[in-house]
């Protein structure tokens, strides 16, 4: 299947008060039509910057230093704002973290969704716009859409506001939907509902989705593939089954061990020791080495390449080198077989 989105060797930096932050470092991945790719990692690892780089929503202080971004085979890396405006909404759209900051509290929900419809369908009559708005509200599970159409965001619960934001994002039937931690501000029960809704919409419309999260447990129920990101780099990528049931990178082991499902009830919940490195001056070698209890000497000297485990599963750890000692994974299996 042809790739809908292909990112190759992408590096993005941001100028800050203390220096240049290397937010995204040599990242490559692809996305097929109708696929759900989850990007997981700690806060500050570059997940959101990566997505905003693709949509060209970066602040003026940020710039793409290297790499390419191709959509439907077309290289958009050097596209300017005018060209990107034609792609946003129709080719890709984004759901942000906090729905309350994405909605105008003084404008009725129906009008806000309608504005998104009109931007991409300028020839629509008022009746056509209203019909499309009601269809979108039904699609995202907003009950009694005709009545809710005339209500304000503050009259909706957090989960319902997120559904409104999803309706706006889907107004132009995008090919790719970026969901940037869409459940962070919601309670656990509502999180599950929103994730199920994302999966339902993806299956109904065939929309490819990139789901950003810091929680491996959250994405388990919806992802087809999972990319684990650390310090601006993808350190492991594979199908959801491969990453969950046969993780190979020590950082992925740490994320898995920190899930409540792995706790036995007698010991404290596992936490990864230390702090992520500064990306103003990333450490030599593997950025995770100083937090990695399984680190080898070479980890402190040289960055690991991506080792192929299967045709769909790759991990950047020297433990997969045939010369490395065989380490038993704390979450099952071994580092290399």
Model regions and ranges:
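Short catalytic/signature loops enriched in Gly
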Residues: 3, 143-146, 239-337
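P-loop NTP-binding/switch modules centered on Walker-like glycine-rich loops
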Residues: 56, 178, 182, 186, ...
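Conserved ABC ATPase "signature" region
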Residues: 74-75, 127-147, 256
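A short, proline-enriched helix->beta-strand linker immediately N-terminal to the Walker B motif
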Residues: 171-175
């Amino acid at each position: 299947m042809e790739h809908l989105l292909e990112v190759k060797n992408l590096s993005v930096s941001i100028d800050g008060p203390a220096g240049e932050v290397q937010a995204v470092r040599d990242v490559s991945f692809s996305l097929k039509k109708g696929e759900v790719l989850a990007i997981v990692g700690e806060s500050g690892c570059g997940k959101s910057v990566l997505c905003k780089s693709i949509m060209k929503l970066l602040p003026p202080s940020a710039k793409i230093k290297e790499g390419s971004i191709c959509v439907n085979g077309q290289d958009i890396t050097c596209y300017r704002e005018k060209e990107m405006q034609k792609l946003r909404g129709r080719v890709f759209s984004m759901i942000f973290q906090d729905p309350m900051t994405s909605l105008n509290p003084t404008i009725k929900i129906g009008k806000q969704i309608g504005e998104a419809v009109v931007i991409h369908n300028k020839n629509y009559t008022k009746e056509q716009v209203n019909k499309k708005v009601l269809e979108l509200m039904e699609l995202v599970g907003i009950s009694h859409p005709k009545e809710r159409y005339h209500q304000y965001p503050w009259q909706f619960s957090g989960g319902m506001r997120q559904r409104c934001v999803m309706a706006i994002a889907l107004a132009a039937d995008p090919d790719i939907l970026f969901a940037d931690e869409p459940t962070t501000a919601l309670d656990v029960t509502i999180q599950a509902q929103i994730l199920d809704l994302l999966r339902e919409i993806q299956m109904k419309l065939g929309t490819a989705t990139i789901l950003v999260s810091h929680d491996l447990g959250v994405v388990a129920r919806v992802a087809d593939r999972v990319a684990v990101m650390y310090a601006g780099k993808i350190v492991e990528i594979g199908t959801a089954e491969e990453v969950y049931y046969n993780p190979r990178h020590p950082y992925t082991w740490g994320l898995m061990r920190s899930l409540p499902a792995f706790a036995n009830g007698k010991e404290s919940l596992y936490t990864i020791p230390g702090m992520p490195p500064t990306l103003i001056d990333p450490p030599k070698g593997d950025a995770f080495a100083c937090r990695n209890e399984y680190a080898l000497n070479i980890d402190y000297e040289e960055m690991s390449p991506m080792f192929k485990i299967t045709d769909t599963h790759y991990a950047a750890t020297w433990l997969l080198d045939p010369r490395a000692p065989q380490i038993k994974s704390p979450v099952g299996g071994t580092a290399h077989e």
